[in-house]
Design a protein with these regions (language model features):
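Residue-level recognition of alpha-helical structural elements
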Residues: 5-8, 12, 33-36, 198, ...
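Extended amphipathic alpha-helical segments enriched in small hydrophobics
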Residues: 13, 169-232
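FAD-binding core of flavoproteins
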Residues: 73-187
Length: 301
């Protein structure tokens, strides 16, 4: 495994980061800005990021975009559509907007009208129902109750590999959200003064942020191994790598987000502080394709 990104992958990362930085929400108030979201939706649709897999992109490329979008709190669909694209590809003449279902819910479903679910016997399609209330302020969910109809044949190998991609993509979302929350906390610690000094100069705050940074670096390591494994290892090995990454990244991201709230002090518990938006996204991404320790062979024997 070569951990270095290629020049094309670095360009992809920079493009995704620029898009998220320019059009993503910079404040909680921006989440209600419909015109901004329309511009963001048009920009994401124009990039073709949602069709990465049918364009031949690897799991690494999908993870790159997912991570940068989560870091910038991009609040238009990516996760659901890119996973749906991997299941069925780009069909000629199909104008529907697709996402995927998990436990009876169409995830990341804003603007989507059709949903796919993967079963042992194949891929099935159904309508996206009414919006389902959720904690995530950046992604909507819809009901996925059917009726279902067979949509596409899928090989056993692809069927076994897709869960690894789904886990890895949600893991990338967790890592990106953790990075965003950490950036928010560090920037605040640099400017918030107490007792004549910025709070970041005090060991109590500095050590908290250093621990968060270490957790993020560990998450990045397991994420990139899992993303590489999606296409390079056998499905069973790829799935195990993805499960391990998801377990580690989920716990790390929650800790990082909670630390970011703590660093902000009283303002961290207010609606206006973006820290809770990152935490909400992390909590929801953790429950998308969740993993137990026993499934990764990490439980107590």
């Amino acid at each position: 495994m070569d951990v270095r990104l290629t020049s094309e992958q670095r360009q992809l990362r920079d493009a995704a980061a620029k898009l998220a930085g320019e059009l993503g929400p910079g404040s909680v108030l921006d989440l209600a800005d419909a015109r901004r979201r329309i511009r963001l939706e048009d920009a994401v649709a124009g990039t073709g990021f949602r069709e990465l897999r049918s364009d031949g992109a690897s799991g690494v490329e999908v993870a790159i975009v997912a991570e940068e979008f989560a870091r910038g709190l991009v609040d238009v669909p990516f996760l659901g559509p890119v996973l749906a694209d991997d299941l069925q590809g780009r069909l000629d003449g199909d104008t529907a907007r697709w996402t995927v279902a998990h436990r009876g819910v169409a995830i990341d479903a804003s603007g989507c009208d059709r949903v796919l679910k993967l079963e042992d016997s194949g891929v099935f399609a159904g309508p996206v129902g009414d919006e389902v209330a959720g904690a995530d302020l950046t992604r909507a969910a819809g009901a996925a109750a059917g009726p279902w109809e067979p949509r596409a044949d899928i090989s056993a190998r692809h069927r076994d590999r897709w869960p690894a991609l789904a886990l890895t993509t949600t893991c990338a979302d967790l890592v990106g959200a953790a990075r965003g929350a950490q950036r928010l906390a560090v920037e605040y610690a640099k400017v918030r003064s107490q007792y004549g000094n910025t709070i970041g100069s005090y060991q109590a705050i500095g050590h908290l942020l250093a621990e968060s940074e270490a957790l993020i670096e560990g998450s990045i390591s397991v994420l990139w191994h899992a993303a590489w494994a999606v296409d390079e290892l056998e499905p069973e090995q790829a799935l195990r790598a993805a499960r391990i990454a998801k377990i580690y990244a989920a716990r790390a991201a929650r800790t990082v987000c909670e630390t970011a709230i703590q660093v902000h002090g009283g303002i961290g518990n207010t609606w206006e502080c973006l820290a809770h938006v990152y935490l909400r996204r992390v909590l929801v991404s953790t429950e998308l394709f969740p993993v137990r320790l026993e499934e990764a062979g990490l439980g107590l024997s």
